[in-house]
């Protein structure tokens, strides 16, 4: 019997599907690897986030795809995820249940591997620098409403303080830490006015032969600060097993970044970046804790209480 995914695939390609495999690890969308005389990625998008904002996300994608094809972007190997169109010419397909789907060609590559040490960290920084250089070629980038507050500490703090259900079981240690540090975190500000990825963790990079060649999950491309991307990237590869910042790794990340984007950020900015990495961790911890308390389910859990555990690690270990 034809599966749901196979029915959706028929709207994009007319080839027999030989394998459907769900890929785990994403927080928001359901992602499937499709094999059908080639490999593809099929995604069921989160309706609560995407409904009503597909045009904005499509506009940003087309701007990014165009920038990836500019001469300066092609000096080294770089891939842009290639969204596919349905038979009716649309990137997105809505099924009879109202679910929104998207399909793109699978990009061969490797994930970030911490076992490669500082070499992969340098290449991650270089890849992020290259991405920022490419994004400079994008015109009229919009701020998709579903992701407009990704790094907005005031937005998430308000959500946190507005939680007042009588049966809510709070974690005293986290409440105390948030109240103690919120003003300090709010006071850390950085320059804005750039186009950024918005979620530039190393899990959204792909590598070939040790070189960063692609960013995936580009729906979060938006106006912002390069510090947001640098902090996301550093948080995902420069924090040790105790939750402390490894400054040696950070220096390698910044060296790669400088080489990838023609000295866009100076090494003298390192101390500000370190403060902003702490703020980045604080905001993410606040989001995990708020999601745990509200039961909203924005972040998928592999076990009950995982979001609370992540919040504890982010909010109670300081750099």
Model-derived segments and their meaning:
Residues 1-21:
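Juxta-kinase regulatory segment immediately upstream of eukaryotic protein kinase catalytic domains
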Residues 17-35:
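ATP-binding glycine-rich phosphate-binding loop
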Residues 21-25, 44, 51-55, 110-122, ...:
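ATP-dependent phospho-/nucleotidyl transfer catalytic cores
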Residues 27-30, 47-150, 226:
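Conserved ATP-binding subdomain of kinase catalytic cores across diverse folds
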Residues 41-48, 218-219:
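Active-site ExK catalytic segment of metal-dependent nucleases
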Residues 208-255, 262, 298-309:
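Active-site Asp-x-Gly
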Residues 257-277:
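Hydrophobic alpha-helical bundle architecture
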Residues 283-319:
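ATP/Mg2+ or Mg2+-diphosphate-binding catalytic cores
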């Amino acid at each position: 019997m034809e599966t749901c995914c196979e029915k959706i695939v028929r709207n994009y390609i007319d080839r027999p599907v030989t394998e459907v495999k769900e890929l785990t690890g994403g927080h928001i969308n359901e992602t499937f690897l499709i094999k059908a005389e080639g490999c593809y990625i099929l995604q069921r998008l989160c309706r609560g986030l995407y409904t009503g904002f597909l045009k904005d996300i499509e506009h940003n994608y087309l701007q990014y795809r165009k920038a990836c094809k500019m001469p300066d972007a092609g000096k080294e190997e770089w891939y842009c995820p290639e969204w596919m169109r349905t038979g009716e010419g649309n990137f997105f397909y809505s099924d009879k249940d109202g679910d929104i789907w998207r399909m793109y060609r699978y990009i061969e590559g490797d994930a970030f591997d911490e076992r490669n040490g500082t070499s992969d960290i340098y290449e991650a920084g270089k890849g992020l620098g290259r991405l920022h250089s490419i994004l400079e070629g994008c015109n009229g980038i919009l701020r998709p409403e579903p992701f407009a507050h990704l790094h907005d500490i005031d937005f998430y703090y308000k959500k946190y303080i507005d939680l007042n259900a009588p049966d809510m079981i709070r974690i005293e240690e986290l409440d105390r830490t948030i109240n103690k540090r919120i003003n300090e975190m709010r006071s850390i500000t950085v320059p804005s006015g750039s186009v950024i990825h918005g979620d530039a963790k190393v899990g959204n990079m792909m590598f070939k032969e040790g070189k960063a060649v692609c960013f995936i999950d580009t729906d979060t491309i938006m106006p912002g600060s390069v510090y947001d991307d640098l902090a996301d990237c550093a948080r995902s590869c420069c924090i040790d097993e105790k939750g402390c910042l490894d400054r040696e790794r950070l220096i390698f990340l910044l060296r790669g970044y400088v080489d990838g984007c023609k000295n866009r950020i100076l090494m003298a900015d390192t101390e500000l970046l370190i403060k902003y990495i702490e703020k980045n961790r604080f905001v993410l911890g606040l989001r995990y804790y708020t999601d745990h308390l509200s039961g909203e389910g924005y972040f998928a859990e592999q076990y009950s209480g995982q979001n609370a555990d992540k919040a504890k690690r982010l909010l109670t270990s300081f750099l």
